[in-house]
């Protein structure tokens, strides 16, 4: 009955109003081309979203790495002619292609062959208004930063007429789930946020967030490795007053964990990384800002409250002058640490993400011979990552900043020792959340191996060891801290919290994790972070992957299994 009513004009209008209040960026109005799909066309709509994600990914990086990033330019108008929808719509071919964004008309003809995200999404909107698909997941002024000023033709005069379209069954179901999601107060652990997010995110956005490399063995092992570590708690200890605060690089923080850098947060919520900044600020937890954020760096930095700490995650560009500008700007804006990603000379095969890109290709372009099957929202980023980055570049990076320098993506003890030799302030034991090389070891397993070596060589007090990947519980954080980690990073859990409930969801997730840490410190018999030592753990099974462990049903329930190839839909579909 609900679906039937939605298909009437009045009911659809009413539901749009409701959906706009629930999430104005996911569902805007009857003019929204993405979400206003005809019946049975959910596949096409998801394809457009997938293409937009690819465009967002590459343009975010391109935007950050333009040489004139910090230079403004005057924008000329096009021959003083009124750029009406009728005129713009005539420029809809590859050799004469205009697009409207934010009420402004751009000539993308010359840019089309060089667009790192591919030509398909631009061609799809040739001679049309692409604002609705572009704005929700891009930093402001992105176009102006990477399209030459002379290609900005001027303002659109008038509006494009939009066709009334009917919602698909799948989209109606998703919007109904958003309406029925439980109140924030019912979230009692980080798994709960993921459960909700998986039901309300558009499929391409979910695929981008949850995808991992190849068979996703490392993704699951990152979490499962914590199940092979058990506690040896102390008893009869006065634990009335427990303090979970710590210091990172000499700066006090309320908890021993931080929010890891993740790309394209606006896919889940219209405020994106700004929502994460707000939620983290309320709880005095460090946020690491991604190079590939969907909000601009300055937007995220501006969202800080006084005293709030943020770190900057960096992909090094082949043009070192571009990297230098970005690093110096981050330092000027008060970033407290520079985290250089070193595990991505090329981005991994994230097949859930790639399958969404395949659907987009088949809908936009009929000739399969021209489709680049290596692409997806993730791999589209790789053209901006310098594969020649090596240890010799550390000296250059140290010369351009006074921020503490940490390399993120270390996966073996030998490289931890090299980092110490190069005078780095820290490393993050990480495999990119299982999104790069599959069958790499879980970071917590590497942590258990490397810390005794550092202590033996007297290096454990000279370099900070951070760890991320697979963390879902306060007990996971405590296990890593007992093994010697300085801090523990979480990425996806906070994306899911933000996607489900915005900045308040981020705050709630932090509070839940803090509560778990404090409670379990009491049960362990410790009062301070400094009292967490290896003696409180039984790690005899950490390296033995054949040891059976109790199933984590909440984690398994949320894990989205990979699927094989699918046939094309039939005519009746």
From Swiss-Prot:
InterPro entries per UniProt: Aldolase_TIM, Cyt_B5-like_heme/steroid-bd, Cyt_B5-like_heme/steroid_sf, Cyt_B5_heme-BS, FMN-dep_DH, FMN_HAD, FMN_hydac_DH_AS, L-MDH/L-LDH_FMN-bd
Name the UniProt record assigns to this protein: L-lactate dehydrogenase (cytochrome)
EC top class, as a word: oxidoreductase
Pfam families linked: Cyt-b5, FMN_dh
Family membership: In the N-terminal section; belongs to the cytochrome b5 family. In the C-terminal section; belongs to the FMN-dependent alpha-hydroxy acid dehydrogenase family.
Single GO MF annotation: metal ion binding
Predominant cellular place of this UniProt entry's protein: mitochondrion
Localization per Swiss-Prot or TrEMBL: Mitochondrion intermembrane space
Highest taxon of the lineage: Eukaryota
Residues the record lists as binding heme b: 115, 138, 208, 357
Domain Cytochrome b5 heme-binding stretches: 80-157
GO biological process, one term: lactate metabolic process
PROSITE patterns for the chain: CYTOCHROME_B5_1 (PS00191), CYTOCHROME_B5_2 (PS50255), FMN_HYDROXY_ACID_DH_1 (PS00557), FMN_HYDROXY_ACID_DH_2 (PS51349)
Catalyzed reactions per annotation: (S)-lactate + 2 Fe(III)-[cytochrome c] = 2 Fe(II)-[cytochrome c] + pyruvate + 2 H(+)
